[in-house]
């Protein structure tokens, strides 16, 4: 993609109201309102993979004690997360860690575009929450196209390393444990 081209995956765009009931915007407004007065140690942001974490024991056992907030929305792609974070979801909180897991729903976008969208989200988080550690989780292997999944991981790892090499607050991982200071287990 040339520098003059617009990347749809990195252009903040409200989510599509597929149910026709305003659910997406209502959920966004709930996140903005719910974050006021909260002091989360961890913020999870992303699509349905993040949203569904509430249903698992690991959330209750590990993340609830950290006063974690879950800003996952089913169906969201990178451009939707970028819009939500640009429009108030980060305004009232200062988490120590932001966990980002998104990209699965970027149908029709190239690996380069999806990577650009993820990097735009990481940059926005850095700008709005400069003290937060950002953890970008790896991608699930897309059943329909394993080659695209692998290319996406390689592209984002390469671009991410080039763009954030001097910043110790960002890590992309395939679900390895990352401790404070960047130590990987």
Where would I find each of the regions flagged by the language model?
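N-terminal secretory targeting modules
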Residues: 1-45, 49-61, 174-176
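Acidic/histidine-rich helix-loop elements
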Residues: 13-16, 70-75
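A Trp-anchored, charged/polar loop motif used as the substrate-binding/catalytic surface
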Residues: 26-30, 34, 76-88
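Short, mixed-charge, low-aromatic patches
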Residues: 35-43, 74-78, 113-116
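Short active-site-adjacent helix-start/loop capping segments
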Residues: 51-54, 77-80, 108
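Alpha-helical cap/lid subdomain in secreted, periplasmic
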Residues: 60-69, 76, 85-185
